Amino acid sequence: MARQRKKLLIVDGYNVLRSGSRYRQVTDPDYTDDTFNVARETLINDVINYAGRDWRAIIVFDGARNAFSTGEAETVGGVRIMFSPAGQSADKVIEKLAHDARERQVETLVVTSDATIQDTVFGFGVDRMSADGFSREVGMHYEDARLDETPKVAQKNTVASRIDPAVLAKLKAMRDGESEPHGR
């Protein structure tokens, strides 16, 4: 049986941070570098968890104004993270990634609320999701995972149910004022 190709998830990093409801703390005009870095790390972790085994994922951040940005990707938790090269916008990188994926007939989803990117990639036949839609999906993903870990049947856990039966017998005997438990 042939191995099924993974789908490609492309995330417009800064757009999602500024537009997704999960990351609203970044839109505060008084955000600090620390707050922004925490939000970026949260997004990266969210993409890692959302992508799981079904998606190959890449997050593209805009590095156009950074003279030192090379456009090289780094992999964290199976997700490729890149800043666009100096002088090139993240939008152009995302459009090229989406176009190339469709040329290879790879099912692709682009997460952005940027209307221009949405229109461009939709023209390539690529699926799209808004930043807020992604925020909701991630929230539901975490909620489903949390529910999967909860016991399905209510179970009463008492100290007596977890203690060695011989020790329990001795404790009962002491409680009842007996010097030795019955049966000895």
Located regions from the model:
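Nuclease catalytic cores that cleave nucleic-acid phosphodiester bonds
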Residues: 2-11, 15-184
